[in-house]
Every structure is written in C-alpha cells, then in structure tokens.
Curated annotation (Swiss-Prot):
It comes from Synechococcus sp. (strain RCC307). GO terms for biological process: photosynthesis. It holds the Pfam family Ycf4. This is Photosystem I assembly protein Ycf4. The lineage of its organism: Bacteria, Bacillati, Cyanobacteriota, Cyanophyceae, Synechococcales. Keywords: Membrane, Photosynthesis, Thylakoid, Transmembrane, Transmembrane helix.
Length: 177
C-alpha cells in the first residue's frame, strides 16, 4: 500500500507579502507622524522638518494618507495572519480519495473527490508578460482543479517533477509537457 501524499500549499505568507505590508506600515506611520508634527508644531520625525508644514491643507492631507495606509496595512497583516489561500492537497490511494483544502477569510474550504474521477494531471505553462505555471487535476465532467499556489511561478523542473510524481501515484497520464 502506498503512503498518502500530503502537499502543503503556500498561501499569503510569502516574503513579498511581508515586505509590502511592512513598507506600507512604515509609510503610513510616517505620514501620520508628519501630520501630527504639522498640527502640534514639533518634529516627531528625525528627518526633515515636518513641523514647518502648514496644517491646512498639507498636514491634513498627510494625515488622510496616513490613515489610509494604516488601514491598508492592517488588512494586509490580517490576510497574512489568516494565511488566505494556504492549505494542503492530500492524495490517499488507500482510501481512494483526494482532499483539497484552502483557507479563506472566514472559513476553511475543503472538498473530497474519489481518485477515479481524475482523468489526468495537467501541467500548464504560459510564458510572456504574465507567466503562468500551474499544476491541475483534469476531472471527468468537471472543470480542472488547480493544485499549485497563485503568485510567483514555480521552477519548470520542480513543476514537471511534481506533476510526474503525482501522475505516477494516481496512475493517470501527464498532460501538457
């Protein structure tokens, strides 16, 4: 009996998301401190002289930008904390099931299907301005089920290796190579 294959899927906890959330947070706090410096007439930032800005309209607009950036960064940190899009793919030939799980904002999305419904493992590679490298299950009478994460393209060798391993495990052909 073959051991089940459990593939973790990386969601929003990627380095690029952490960097964007950090930069937006720093920028938002900077704008808020600039606005506060303008209002109170004291420099709260070590660079520049934001206390010299006129409160209306410059300090007020800086405060509005700061509030917007802090709200956006709060959303980004919440998405990272929840790990939206993360989950796992579990292939169990012993139980004849495939379980796909992904985290959403408010719930865990999970569905199970029998291994017999899989016609093939599909490798999709599209290069160009918006590259796409995706591994999917082709099902009988239904749409393809994507297995790989959204975002940065996976290395071609890793995609082919993973697709071939999965096709061998499920005893189905590998398409698109």
């Amino acid at each position: 009996m073959d051991a089940p294959i459990d593939q973790p899927v990386l969601g929003s906890r990627r380095l690029s998301n952490y960097l964007v959330a950090l930069l937006v947070s720093i920028g938002g706090v900077g704008f808020l401190l600039t606005s506060a410096s303008s209002y109170f007439g004291r420099d709260f930032l070590p660079i520049g002289h934001p206390a010299e800005l006129i409160w209306v309209p410059q300090g007020l607009v800086m405060g509005a930008y700061g509030v917007g950036a802090v709200l956006l960064s709060s959303y980004l940190w919440a998405v990272i904390a929840i790990d939206v899009g993360g989950g796992r793919n579990l292939f169990d030939r012993g139980a004849d099931t495939i379980t796909i799980e992904r985290r959403g904002f408010r719930r865990l999305i999970s569905f199970t299907l029998p291994c017999g419904d899989v016609q093939a493992v599909k490798v999709e590679v599209r290069d160009g301005l918006n590259p796409r490298r995706r591994l999917a299950l082709r099902l009988r009478g239904r749409r393809d089920v994507p297995l790989t994460r959204v975002g940065e393209p996976i290395a071609l060798a890793e995609l082919e290796r993973s697709g071939a391993e999965l096709a061998r495990y499920l005893n189905v052909p590998l398409e698109g190579v």
